Amino acid sequence: MLHDLKTLWKIKRFRVLLTARTLSNIGNGMSPIAMAFGVLSLPGSNASSLSWVTASHMVPIVLFLLLGGVVADRMGRARVVGYADIVGSFVVATSGVLFLTGHATVPLLCVNAFIFGTLNALWWPAFAGLLPEVVPSENLQAANSLVGLGTNIGFTLGATMGAAIVSTVGPGWAIIGDGLTFLIAGILVLQLQLPTKMQTGEITKHPSMISQLRQGWSEFYSRKWIVVIVVCFAFINMCFEGFLGVLAPVQMKEALGGARDMGLMLFAFGAGNIGGVLVSLRLKPKHPLIVAMGGMPIVGFWMLGAAVPFHIGVLMILAFVSGIAMDLFFVMWMTMFQTHVPEESLSRVSAYDALGSTVFAPFGLFLAGPIAHWIGTSETLYIAGVIAIVMACAALFNKDVRRLEPIAELVKVD
């Protein structure tokens, strides 16, 4: 493990990428608390209002992910990530200014959320394929772990800062801080200056966009373990997005300590994410996806705990363990994904992965508020928790998921 860490730290491009991801996730930690309690503070707003804003961010991600995968493979992943972060920083900052000037409305925030979601649709497939361009393939698990560690330290710090800023000076400044982190991260990523395959002469002409999408689909669908996990996560993410984006803030406001308790719970979740990364640095399981999916049911139990609702201390414990489980999944999944899928198709296959995994997430966000208003927040959380537990367990019934092993001999990249 220490050898991997020393090797990675000597790679300048990896250090730059790690720094950028850590910084941007400080903003990502601020954003959920700031936007949720900012929207809920608007005159006449309720859980349904928050559903509209959060879903407006998720819908374009689902709509444009496949386009994002093709764009990333054509234009260069570092370039797409960098420019998406920079443009996104101004979009986010605009929302912050709307809150500060008293001009924030649900329709305006929905428009901004849609624009930012479109940029995220370009960002995700590009970032998913970026790491294998930066580090040797035999160090990918350690690299994913370290990026996850930086990501989660940033998120945990951001959640703490976000709760403090929202509680003292309001959501507007926290959202502007979020935008600033994206601006710095985007500038850093553009410094990587990774050449595209067209620039290196590996290819002289891009195939058509349609043929690239078909090739990506073929690579995606031919790996049944990817398809099974993606289908299960379509339902898990539907529940989790509705939980974290709408139901948890509403439950905190109605039954617990508001933004302060939401910040504490997100802090515990981020700390668990860090713990999961540290555990993943030590693990070399023969069947990584058994480990990855084996802990995911705890996320559903976290939702059930919020439904009761338990004391914030208990919810922090559930959030912490859920964080461990989710980051173990992330590291194992990304390592298997990056080593079993051809490098030249990574962004496109990742786009199909992200599209399938998030296809129901807008419904979770759109419906969470109205259903909670109709049958109650706790009752809605019970339903979400049960669905998440069932789907997390279902993946392990597939033999391809259970039997997948790491590739013994990995080819180095320059």
Predicted regions and their residues:
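Helix-loop boundary and gating motifs at the non-cytosolic
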Residues: 3-59, 218-269
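Short, membrane-interfacial amphipathic segments enriched in basic
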Residues: 1-10, 200-211
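Substrate-agnostic recognition of the 12-TM MFS/MFS-like secondary transporter fold
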Residues: 15-32, 54-70, 76-91, 108-167, ...
